[in-house]
Amino acid sequence: MNTIQKKFIALLILLMITSCGFHMRGMTEISFKTISLEGKELSFTKNLKKVLNSNKVAIVLPSENPELRVELIGEESEKRILSLSGQGLVREYEIFYRVRYRIKTADSETWGQENILETRRDFTYSDSNVISKEEEERQLNESMRNEAITNLFNQIQLNKK
């Protein structure tokens, strides 16, 4: 196959994919331009602000009448034993990350109900690999915070539509 044929086939495939409505996964178009983040400063607040800014949403004070107000009420992490070995040693842990929040739109008089976002992961544990398992747990916690940001962003989108 020569170069022209390869380019033609690539173009044909690209046309077929775009004509069926396919698009890369990512953040959707934002239906609001201003938001106020209120309440507690959580461990993921800084990254949430980055996501909002990258989507061209201005973070303003509540007194500036934002289109949407989000109150971050709190967060909590939990770790519990999922399974034990025959000798009574921990084999698996389950970790949770929860964020409590509520939303108020510009046209509503009161805050919406308190919502909870929860993410969960489990991982194996071994006393012989303590350092690597601690690093794995740290990475899983970071992953859960990022998932919570994505989920909160999606909930904000749903409330504004």
Task: List each language-model region with its residue ranges.
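Sec/Tat-exported extracytoplasmic proteins
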Residues: 52, 56, 103-107, 127, ...
